Structures are given as structure tokens and as C-alpha cells.
Amino acid sequence: MRRRDFNRMALGFGLGSSVITPVAAQDPAAKTKPAGGAAAPTVISNTGRTYNQLHLPRKYAQGQRRFSVYWAWNYPWEANRDVTELDNRFSTMTEVRRVEWPFYEKPEYAERMFLQGIAGTLELFHLSLVKFQNSVGEVTGQPVSVYQRIDQAGQRLPLDERILADTDTLMVFGLDHMVTEQEASADEIAALQQFLTREGTCLIIGPHHDVGASADMDERQMEYKHHGDELVPRQQRFGLYTRSLMKGLGVPVENRYGLRPATVKETGDITPLNAMRDLDSRGWLNGVTTFNFHPHLPHYAVTTDDPKAIRILGKQAIELSIPHPFTRAGNKEFNAFLWMPPDGARAGDILLVDLTIFTTLFGGTDSLDSFWKNLATKA
């Protein structure tokens, strides 16, 4: 795999050298409200990181959306996976260092400073979200809350009022390996249905890829060669929790494959998003021309024939020079961004977009910043 490609992948998941440097933390206590009633942006400062404490509810303020991120994984089960297993687990930090040697041979990644097992990789994902948290916090004047279904200490937190009561936009990240058997309960489905009856709410569902679903070993190898990421095994199936969530909520979508986006030959940048702007009546993609590069992105397959059930707002061109079963079937693009506007008793929006759009330190482009800002202001 070319270094350029790995660095893009690494940045896409936040595996850049900057993840260990001090990061800006949100300080909601430092907010002030100026004369005239306009909301002041969140003051960002290098405050201390906290852990092992209960969430302090955020107060509702008109025009200041309260974002919550929900990692749908079982952290201990993911971190404790048998590293002799070839498939359906995250890489260890040691494996990341070996593949990209000597990029990570720095004091901040040494065993004295950073976890070397699978847990180290999971923590990189957490750190990779900070830029999005700070960017949205500046726009909304509200801190972004981050939850885990089962955290490092084995504390279980299903989706319920403890999360939803002070949330306007809920982001569910489907980075749980299917073998860990995370599924939404009937109570969680009911809680989300009730949440979406509240006007102005938004549910963003972000299941990641489903690589190697076929039992055919040759097909798995073709998928592996297509995305080219040495850290992704021949089978890595994510998102059972989000699949069960979508089924329970009547969202006719399934995450499939891990597809490599096409790039511009001269620059190596990802090709522009094929945006269906005539269907984007809310303006989610205003000022957005591209998402960020990631070598294995899911195709969000629509599983209904009803054209009114869901709108495909963005498609991404696939790298066609490296074969894949999906492209051999005649496909040249994959569904990257979908929207279900409010309908009937559901007053809230439902959006589908891959979680790597948010877990990135590469997201300093105007296009991606515009997308984040739109999510914070258009719902």
C-alpha cells in the first residue's frame, strides 16, 4: 500500500501524529450571552480532560443545537478480542506501528505513554472526534456529549432518556463488530421513536463498512485488494447495532461493502460528491463539494422500491481501476448520504452518512467544515 494512501486512511480515522498533542476542550462554563439575545459561540480552551463522572444536562436554548454522539460498541469486548484471530477485530496499536514503520516510532506512541493493544486503536477513534466536537461547539454554543454503549469500565448505557432528554441531534456510530452482538432493544427503539416526535430533532446513523460478507474466499480477496488497507482483515463486518436500529425505525437501508472512492489523478484528492441538490430542500449540502477520503466506505443500499421513502442526496464515484464485486456488477458510484425528511408522527429528520465524515483530523477543508456547520444549523 502506498504511503499516501495509508496516511489518508490514518487521517480519516485520526491516526495522525497530532492526536497525542494537547487538544482543545470545550468549556461550557465559559460561555456568555451578549446583549440582544444572540447566542455566543462556545469558548474553547485547553482545560483538563475529565473521566468517570456523570453527564451534566445541557439547557435548551433556541438556535443552539445539543449534539450527542453514541458509540454503539462494547468497548471491553472489542479491546479484549483474541489477537490471534485474523478477522472481525480492530488492529492493535502495535500492528499499526508495524505497518507504518517508522511513522509511529515516537515517544508519544511508546508503551509508557500510549496503549499498545486494541484499546489504543479505540482511543485513537475517540481522539479523532475532538475536531468535530470543537467545531460544532463553536457553532452551537453547546458542548458535544459523547457516550458509549458499554464503556471501558464495563458500564452499560442503552439509548434512553438519560441521553435523549438533552439532545437535539443524536449521532449513532456503528463501529461495533457484528460478532460482539450489539442489538437495539425494543425499549431503545421506542425511546428513539418518542425522541423523533419532538419537533427539530435529528437522528444521524453512521454504520461503517461490511467487508468480506461473502463466503467466497476469492471474493473476499478481491475486496481486500480493492480497498488496499493492510490493517483491514479479509472479513470485517461492522454495524449490527445500527442495522437493528434501522430495522426497528423503518429505515430501509443496509450498509454493504467497503469501497474505495475515486480520486483526481493530478492531485490524488477525492473526486467531487455527486450531489442531488434538487432533492436537498433543506440545504444539507450547501457549500459542500466533497467529503473526506477513506479507502473503505460503505454503500448504503436502499432496500425499498418506494421512491418517497428516502432521498439519496449524495453519491460517490468508486475507484474503477481495481476490481470489486460491486463494480463488476456494473456499479460506478455508491450511496454516501441519504435523508428521510419528517413524515407523519415522526417530526425529526433521519440522516445516513458514514461515521468517518466526523472522526477525522483531516477535516480542515472548507467543504467538510460547511457540512458540519449545515448539520448544526439546518435541522
Which positions does each model-derived feature cover?
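N-terminal export signals
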Residues: 5-24
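Short, surface-exposed patches at the edges or C-terminal ends of soluble domains, predominantly
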Residues: 26-379
